[in-house]
UniProtKB/Swiss-Prot annotation:
InterPro entries: Ribosomal_bL9 (IPR000244), Ribosomal_bL9/RNase_H1_N (IPR009027), Ribosomal_bL9_N (IPR020070), Ribosomal_bL9_N_sf (IPR036935). It comes from Drosophila melanogaster (Fruit fly). This is Large ribosomal subunit protein bL9m. The keyword NAD does not apply. Residues 1-25 form a transit peptide. One of its GO terms (biological process) is translation. One of its GO terms (cellular component) is mitochondrion. Component of the mitochondrial ribosome large subunit (39S) which comprises a 16S rRNA and about 50 distinct proteins. The keyword rRNA-binding does not apply. One of its GO terms (molecular function) is structural constituent of ribosome.
Protein backbone atom coordinates (compact mmCIF):
# COMPACT_ATOMS: atom_id res chain seq x y z
CA UNK A 1 0.00 0.00 0.00
CA UNK A 2 2.83 2.38 0.80
CA UNK A 3 4.35 1.72 -2.60
CA UNK A 4 1.37 3.31 -4.33
CA UNK A 5 1.78 6.62 -2.52
CA UNK A 6 3.07 9.32 -4.87
CA UNK A 7 5.89 11.31 -3.35
CA UNK A 8 6.00 14.94 -4.53
CA UNK A 9 9.61 16.18 -4.91
CA UNK A 10 10.49 19.33 -2.98
CA UNK A 11 11.92 22.18 -5.02
CA UNK A 12 12.51 24.56 -2.15
CA UNK A 13 16.21 24.99 -2.91
CA UNK A 14 15.86 25.00 -6.68
CA UNK A 15 17.21 28.13 -8.34
CA UNK A 16 14.83 30.37 -10.20
CA UNK A 17 14.95 30.19 -13.98
CA UNK A 18 14.39 33.90 -14.52
CA UNK A 19 15.21 37.05 -12.62
CA UNK A 20 12.18 38.96 -11.44
CA UNK A 21 13.04 42.53 -10.59
CA UNK A 22 10.87 45.49 -9.85
CA UNK A 23 10.80 48.13 -12.56
CA UNK A 24 10.30 51.66 -11.32
CA UNK A 25 8.52 53.20 -14.27
CA UNK A 26 5.58 55.51 -13.70
CA UNK A 27 3.89 57.49 -16.45
CA UNK A 28 1.49 60.34 -15.71
CA UNK A 29 -1.14 60.59 -18.45
CA UNK A 30 -4.22 62.66 -19.21
CA UNK A 31 -7.09 62.12 -21.62
CA UNK A 32 -6.97 64.14 -24.80
CA UNK A 33 -10.78 64.10 -25.03
CA UNK A 34 -12.98 64.13 -21.92
CA UNK A 35 -15.37 61.17 -21.55
CA UNK A 36 -19.12 61.87 -22.01
CA UNK A 37 -21.07 62.84 -18.91
CA UNK A 38 -23.97 60.83 -17.51
CA UNK A 39 -26.77 61.55 -15.06
CA UNK A 40 -26.64 60.58 -11.42
CA UNK A 41 -27.56 56.97 -10.62
CA UNK A 42 -27.61 56.08 -14.29
CA UNK A 43 -25.43 53.81 -16.35
CA UNK A 44 -22.33 55.60 -17.75
CA UNK A 45 -22.40 56.30 -21.42
CA UNK A 46 -20.28 54.19 -23.67
CA UNK A 47 -16.96 55.81 -24.53
CA UNK A 48 -15.70 56.07 -28.05
CA UNK A 49 -12.26 55.31 -29.43
CA UNK A 50 -11.10 58.89 -29.15
CA UNK A 51 -11.73 58.81 -25.39
CA UNK A 52 -8.89 56.29 -25.05
CA UNK A 53 -6.30 58.64 -26.52
CA UNK A 54 -3.89 59.88 -23.84
CA UNK A 55 -1.24 62.57 -23.67
CA UNK A 56 1.99 62.13 -21.71
CA UNK A 57 2.32 64.55 -18.80
CA UNK A 58 5.35 63.18 -16.93
CA UNK A 59 7.78 60.29 -17.37
CA UNK A 60 9.50 59.47 -14.09
CA UNK A 61 12.06 57.26 -15.83
CA UNK A 62 13.80 60.21 -17.48
CA UNK A 63 13.02 62.70 -14.73
CA UNK A 64 16.08 64.03 -12.95
CA UNK A 65 16.37 62.57 -9.48
CA UNK A 66 17.28 64.83 -6.57
CA UNK A 67 20.72 64.69 -5.00
CA UNK A 68 21.40 62.53 -1.95
CA UNK A 69 23.14 63.86 1.14
CA UNK A 70 25.71 61.59 2.78
CA UNK A 71 28.30 61.86 5.55
CA UNK A 72 31.86 60.92 4.60
CA UNK A 73 33.59 58.33 6.79
CA UNK A 74 37.07 59.18 5.49
CA UNK A 75 38.82 61.46 3.03
CA UNK A 76 37.60 60.99 -0.55
CA UNK A 77 39.59 62.60 -3.33
CA UNK A 78 37.56 65.24 -5.14
CA UNK A 79 34.63 64.99 -2.69
CA UNK A 80 35.60 66.00 0.84
CA UNK A 81 37.16 65.07 4.16
CA UNK A 82 35.92 62.91 7.03
CA UNK A 83 32.74 64.23 8.66
CA UNK A 84 31.75 66.45 5.71
CA UNK A 85 28.12 66.38 4.57
CA UNK A 86 28.02 66.39 0.77
CA UNK A 87 25.12 66.39 -1.67
CA UNK A 88 25.77 64.51 -4.92
CA UNK A 89 24.00 62.61 -7.70
CA UNK A 90 22.38 59.28 -6.72
CA UNK A 91 24.34 57.18 -9.22
CA UNK A 92 27.69 58.46 -7.94
CA UNK A 93 26.63 58.16 -4.29
CA UNK A 94 25.49 54.53 -4.62
CA UNK A 95 28.45 53.25 -6.65
CA UNK A 96 31.37 55.34 -5.39
CA UNK A 97 30.50 56.18 -1.79
CA UNK A 98 27.89 53.89 -0.22
CA UNK A 99 28.89 50.54 -1.76
CA UNK A 100 32.64 50.90 -0.99
CA UNK A 101 31.75 51.98 2.56
CA UNK A 102 33.20 55.48 2.25
CA UNK A 103 30.04 57.27 3.37
CA UNK A 104 26.74 56.85 5.22
CA UNK A 105 23.34 58.49 4.89
CA UNK A 106 22.95 61.94 6.38
CA UNK A 107 21.31 61.42 9.77
CA UNK A 108 21.99 63.15 13.11
CA UNK A 109 23.39 59.89 14.46
CA UNK A 110 25.82 59.45 11.56
CA UNK A 111 26.90 63.10 11.69
CA UNK A 112 27.83 62.70 15.36
CA UNK A 113 29.40 59.28 14.79
CA UNK A 114 31.73 60.27 11.95
CA UNK A 115 32.61 63.77 13.14
CA UNK A 116 36.30 64.59 13.46
CA UNK A 117 37.91 64.27 16.87
CA UNK A 118 40.17 66.93 18.34
CA UNK A 119 43.26 64.89 17.46
CA UNK A 120 42.14 64.53 13.85
CA UNK A 121 41.41 68.25 13.56
CA UNK A 122 44.91 69.13 14.73
CA UNK A 123 46.50 66.76 12.19
CA UNK A 124 45.73 68.12 8.72
CA UNK A 125 46.64 65.71 5.92
CA UNK A 126 44.80 67.34 3.00
CA UNK A 127 44.33 71.05 2.44
CA UNK A 128 41.33 70.61 0.11
CA UNK A 129 39.39 67.81 -1.63
CA UNK A 130 41.07 68.60 -4.96
CA UNK A 131 44.67 69.08 -3.79
CA UNK A 132 45.60 65.40 -4.10
CA UNK A 133 44.05 65.28 -7.56
CA UNK A 134 46.28 68.19 -8.59
CA UNK A 135 49.31 66.36 -7.19
CA UNK A 136 48.46 63.26 -9.21
CA UNK A 137 48.09 65.28 -12.41
CA UNK A 138 51.38 67.12 -11.91
CA UNK A 139 53.27 63.88 -11.29
CA UNK A 140 51.99 62.27 -14.50
CA UNK A 141 53.06 64.98 -16.98
CA UNK A 142 56.44 65.77 -18.53
CA UNK A 143 56.78 69.54 -18.50
CA UNK A 144 58.58 71.07 -21.49
CA UNK A 145 60.80 73.94 -20.31
CA UNK A 146 61.71 76.00 -23.39
CA UNK A 147 64.87 78.09 -22.98
CA UNK A 148 66.74 80.49 -25.25
CA UNK A 149 69.35 78.98 -27.56
CA UNK A 150 71.14 82.25 -28.37
CA UNK A 151 71.31 84.16 -25.07
CA UNK A 152 72.85 82.94 -21.77
CA UNK A 153 70.38 82.06 -19.03
CA UNK A 154 70.08 80.53 -15.58
CA UNK A 155 67.03 78.46 -14.75
CA UNK A 156 64.77 80.22 -12.22
CA UNK A 157 61.34 79.44 -10.73
CA UNK A 158 59.58 81.85 -13.07
CA UNK A 159 60.67 79.70 -16.04
CA UNK A 160 58.83 76.75 -14.51
CA UNK A 161 55.88 79.00 -13.72
CA UNK A 162 55.62 80.13 -17.36
CA UNK A 163 55.89 76.56 -18.63
CA UNK A 164 53.17 75.40 -16.24
CA UNK A 165 50.91 78.23 -17.40
CA UNK A 166 51.18 76.93 -20.98
CA UNK A 167 49.85 73.56 -19.85
CA UNK A 168 46.98 75.02 -17.82
CA UNK A 169 48.49 75.08 -14.31
CA UNK A 170 48.79 78.36 -12.43
CA UNK A 171 51.06 78.68 -9.39
CA UNK A 172 53.27 81.21 -7.66
CA UNK A 173 57.03 81.28 -7.82
CA UNK A 174 57.26 80.67 -4.06
CA UNK A 175 55.61 77.26 -4.57
CA UNK A 176 58.37 76.02 -6.90
CA UNK A 177 61.56 74.47 -5.51
CA UNK A 178 64.36 73.93 -8.02
CA UNK A 179 67.21 71.42 -7.69
CA UNK A 180 70.14 72.42 -5.53
CA UNK A 181 72.57 72.42 -8.43
CA UNK A 182 72.60 75.40 -10.76
CA UNK A 183 71.16 74.84 -14.25
CA UNK A 184 72.44 77.25 -16.87
CA UNK A 185 72.81 77.44 -20.61
CA UNK A 186 72.51 77.45 -23.51
CA UNK A 187 74.05 73.99 -23.65
CA UNK A 188 72.97 71.54 -26.34
CA UNK A 189 74.31 68.69 -24.22
CA UNK A 190 71.36 69.32 -21.92
CA UNK A 191 68.82 69.15 -24.74
CA UNK A 192 65.97 66.72 -23.95
CA UNK A 193 67.47 65.95 -20.53
CA UNK A 194 65.20 65.53 -17.52
CA UNK A 195 65.29 67.04 -14.05
CA UNK A 196 62.81 67.22 -11.19
CA UNK A 197 61.43 70.13 -9.20
CA UNK A 198 58.93 70.27 -6.34
CA UNK A 199 55.63 72.14 -6.47
CA UNK A 200 54.02 72.87 -3.09
CA UNK A 201 50.21 73.14 -3.04
CA UNK A 202 48.50 75.17 -0.31
CA UNK A 203 51.71 74.97 1.77
CA UNK A 204 50.96 71.29 2.50
CA UNK A 205 50.90 68.82 -0.42
CA UNK A 206 54.00 68.44 -2.56
CA UNK A 207 54.17 67.21 -6.14
CA UNK A 208 57.33 65.92 -7.82
CA UNK A 209 57.28 67.50 -11.29
CA UNK A 210 59.32 66.02 -14.14
CA UNK A 211 60.75 68.69 -16.46
CA UNK A 212 62.54 68.40 -19.81
CA UNK A 213 64.78 71.09 -21.32
CA UNK A 214 64.31 72.34 -24.89
CA UNK A 215 66.31 75.03 -26.67
CA UNK A 216 64.53 77.54 -28.90
CA UNK A 217 65.89 80.16 -31.27
CA UNK A 218 64.13 83.17 -32.75
CA UNK A 219 66.06 82.58 -35.97
CA UNK A 220 64.22 79.89 -37.98
CA UNK A 221 67.48 78.67 -39.53
CA UNK A 222 69.00 78.00 -36.09
CA UNK A 223 66.08 76.08 -34.63
CA UNK A 224 66.43 72.45 -33.68
CA UNK A 225 64.26 69.83 -35.43
CA UNK A 226 60.80 69.50 -33.95
CA UNK A 227 60.27 66.38 -31.84
CA UNK A 228 56.74 65.01 -32.04
CA UNK A 229 55.29 63.90 -28.68
CA UNK A 230 58.58 64.22 -26.84
CA UNK A 231 57.01 63.02 -23.57
CA UNK A 232 56.65 59.51 -24.99
CA UNK A 233 60.35 59.19 -25.75
CA UNK A 234 62.96 57.91 -23.34
CA UNK A 235 65.51 60.43 -22.14
CA UNK A 236 68.51 60.70 -19.85
CA UNK A 237 68.64 62.60 -16.56
CA UNK A 238 70.37 65.95 -16.53
CA UNK A 239 73.96 65.34 -15.44
CA UNK A 240 74.83 66.18 -11.84
CA UNK A 241 71.31 67.46 -11.19
CA UNK A 242 69.20 65.60 -8.65
CA UNK A 243 65.59 66.05 -7.71
CA UNK A 244 64.97 68.37 -4.75
CA UNK A 245 64.21 66.79 -1.43
CA UNK A 246 60.68 67.11 -0.14
CA UNK A 247 60.39 69.10 3.03
CA UNK A 248 58.80 67.18 5.93
Amino acid sequence: MLKNIYVTPLNLLKSATSLQQQVRTTFVLKRKYDPPLHKTNEKPRRMRAKNFIYELVDDTLVKKRPNIEVVLKTFVEGVGDKGDVVSMKPHFVYNKLLLPGLAAYNTPENVAKYAKTEAEKSTVKHSSPYAQRTVNMLETIVLAVVMNKDEPWVLEPWHIKASLRKTGFYCREECITLPKERIEGPDLKKENKDFYCTVTINKLEQARLKCRLHHWSTDPSERLPYVLEHWKLQSEPLLDVCSPEKTP
